[in-house]
Curated annotation (Swiss-Prot):
Keyword Nucleotide-binding: yes
Family the UniProt entry places it in: Belongs to the ABC transporter superfamily. Heme (hemin) importer (TC 3.A.1.14.5) family.
NCBIfam families: PRK13548.1
Gene3D superfamilies named among the record's database cross-references: P-loop containing nucleotide triphosphate hydrolases (3.40.50.300)
Protein name as catalogued: Hemin import ATP-binding protein HmuV
Keywords: ATP-binding, Cell inner membrane, Cell membrane, Membrane, Nucleotide-binding, Translocase, Transport
Segments forming domain ABC transporter: 2-242
Species in which this protein is naturally found: Bartonella quintana (strain Toulouse)
Record's bilayer topology term: Peripheral membrane protein
Ranges annotated as spanning the membrane: none
SUBUNIT field: The complex is composed of two ATP-binding proteins (HmuV), two transmembrane proteins (HmuU) and a solute-binding protein (HmuT).
Gene name of the record: hmuV
Amino acid sequence: MIEAVNICVQRGKKQILNHIDFQAKSSALTVIIGPNGSGKSTFVKALSGEIPYSGKMTLNGHDVTHTKTYEMAAMRAVLPQFTTLAFPFLVHEVVALGLSVNQFTIAKKQLQNLPQKALECVGLADYGNRHYHQLSGGEQARVQLARVLCQIWEPVCNKVPRWMILDEPIANLDIQHQLVVMNIARNFARCGGGVLAVLHDLNLAAHYADKMILLKQGKIYCEGSASTVLTTQNLSDAYHCSLPVSELPKADTPFVLPQTASFL
């Protein structure tokens, strides 16, 4: 479980996160949504240890601030919104960066095959010897997801759930590969792991999320199931535009349809 208690992040005089409290459980896909500047990526950075915060954050009962880096790496893998590599890596070398924490939990022969298996999962089976910097933005994003998979290949290790922390994992992808990524995330959760993902696509969020958290101006505006969070009133208040919500025929999933030129 990820548990956040009274999390605050301040930059200069600006309060980015303001007393955030929530829980995300393993075996579930939790999605954070909200407008730009609402604090979504800031929360991910706090959880991954990139930025300081006040309050308490725990992952599987371990205090994020006081747990050793390698111990955290064995429990969770982070896919940041933006990734910059300083060296001219080949694709298989980038993916293999995720292997180090698995060297004591997975047999050596299986470990050697993991990068290729991970690339197959994201639809890049033949890309191993290509130069990472020559790939498109969407292809690079999928390579980074393969790295995440290498790091936490087994959703549960020694009876402890592992976590995917994904910050806008489908931002640069076409619809086919958006679905590939979201299916990987959902299957990881179904196998006992935990997934916390930041998404902007409200309809994909509605389809895949077991729990949704809507942020507005650094605070949790509401949380719960998709049908609880994705209401016309909630979305209009958070996004300041008209976002009518209906249900798809023969489905119990909300559908959000933005209206052109109807900003509030």
